[in-house]
Structure formats: structure tokens, C-alpha cells
């Protein structure tokens, strides 16, 4: 496990140094995703993040409400870009804009009915997805429910076609 984490970290550092994302390509990608999956961040954020991670090797960024029980899944899953910004199915954001968004909500849409932000938002970087897989069984070992598998395959194909080969 330590070797796997070392390799993932080394690859991520190499990508950070060698590859800068073209933000216009990322905006084009998000436009396509939002048109095809308008509710991507209402339950499908982990599917988008896993597909993006599998194409780019970039780390996950888990958004956690520290007021909820520890065994609860993250309230949102994003990808950390080499420049420190975050990306999800809605677009490119900063940590500050994510915090502002969640604090502006009285109720967290798309999550548990009636759930409100209980505590402080925590950002947890997950380089290889091992933490994420503990929360989302359907993402463990690359397995999905049938509907998530179809969405995942389609989103993966879109990401590859827009960003090109890595």
C-alpha cells in the first residue's frame, strides 16, 4: 500500500510539473457534461470524479461536513487540478467558492432530505481513491450499479475525447 501511494504521489507531482491543463478544454468538457447530465452534482459527482481521475491520474478532493457522523460519505467529490483549483461536473472552482456555495445553502440539495450543513467543511485529498472506495461501494474495484456503469463509461469517453490522450 505504501508503494502504491508513493507511485501515485510521484506521478501526481510529475503531472503538476509537466502538464498544465488548458482551461478552455476543461470549460468545453464541463459544457458537454452539463448538457448531457444536468444533475451530475446531485448524486453523480463521484462517478464524474472517478472517470476524470482514471483519465488524468489527478487526486480526488473529498468535501466533508465535520458535523456529520464519521462513517457518512463525503457531501461532494471533486478533482484537484495541478494549479490547486478544483473541478466537478459544474466547472472549475476554488476552495473558497466551494465553501461560499455550501454556506449559502439552507438545505443541501441532492443529499439527505432535510440535511443541513452541520459543521465546518473539510477538504481531504485522496491521491489514489482508497478513502473514496471505503465510502462508495459502487466505486470499489471499478464496479458500479448498472446505471452508474453506463454513465461512467459515457463520461469516461467524453473526457478522453475532449482532453485527448494522457
Feature locations, PLM:
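Protein-protein interaction and targeting regions used for scaffolding, dimerization, and localization
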Residues: 1-18
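A structural boundary/capping signal
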Residues: 15-166
Amino acid at each position: 500500500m505504501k508503494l502504491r501511494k508513493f507511485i501515485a504521489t510521484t506521478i501526481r507531482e510529475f503531472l503538476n510539473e509537466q502538464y498544465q491543463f488548458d482551461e478552455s478544454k476543461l470549460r468545453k468538457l464541463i459544457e458537454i457534461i452539463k448538457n448531457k447530465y444536468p444533475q451530475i452534482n446531485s448524486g453523480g459527482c463521484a462517478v464524474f470524479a472517478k472517470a476524470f481521475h482514471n483519465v488524468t491520474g489527478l487526486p480526488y478532493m473529498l468535501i466533508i461536513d465535520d458535523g456529520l457522523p464519521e462513517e457518512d460519505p463525503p457531501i461532494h467529490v471533486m478533482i484537484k487540478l495541478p494549479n490547486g483549483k478544483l473541478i466537478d461536473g459544474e466547472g472549475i472552482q476554488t476552495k473558497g467558492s466551494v465553501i461560499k456555495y455550501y454556506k449559502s445553502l439552507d438545505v443541501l440539495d441532492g443529499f439527505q432530505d432535510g440535511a443541513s450543513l452541520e459543521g465546518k467543511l473539510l477538504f481531504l485529498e485522496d491521491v489514489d481513491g482508497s478513502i473514496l472506495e471505503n465510502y462508495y461501494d459502487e466505486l470499489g474495484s471499478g464496479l458500479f450499479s448498472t446505471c452508474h456503469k453506463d454513465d461512467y463509461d459515457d463520461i469516461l469517453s467524453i473526457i478522453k475525447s475532449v482532453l485527448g490522450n494522457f
